[in-house]
């Protein structure tokens, strides 16, 4: 059985560049940044303070995914916080529980910071998140694209 673990990226971590590359692969149309710009954004995010965290997952020591806990999300966003954002698992590591582990670790980071709820937007993974205890709060539109606003009660 594979060994999977998550950890918080620290300022100056060499993995930041890899996470930035993954973020551009998955969300480049939304991020609208060059690789160097996204590396800088992620470095600033990691150094940004207590309310935000960048997590990485490793599978048998190999980088396999990332996820963010962030106080804000897509603009204009709903006036709630914090957000689970930027979940990405490397294609060859999908369907091994890495996404679930990253979500759980992100939820725990939110809980440790005293939050009772956490939120996310998704366009195509509603059933996946519902299976993890999340619920749809609202169907909305973002840039003419349907999205679901979802929440998870961290007290449960």
Show where each model-derived region lies.
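A short beta-loop-alpha structural element at the N-terminal edge
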Residues: 2-19
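Conserved GNAT-fold acetyl-CoA-binding loop/helix
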Residues: 24-44
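Short loop/turn motifs at secondary-structure junctions and domain boundaries
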Residues: 45-50
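Conserved beta-strand in the GNAT
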Residues: 54-56, 62-72, 83, 88
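Conserved acetyl-CoA pyrophosphate-binding loop and the N-cap/start of the following alpha-helix
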Residues: 93, 97-105
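C-terminal "cap" of GNAT-fold acetyltransferases
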Residues: 116-125, 138-156
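Conserved acetyl-CoA-binding loop of GNAT-fold acetyltransferases
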Residues: 130-140
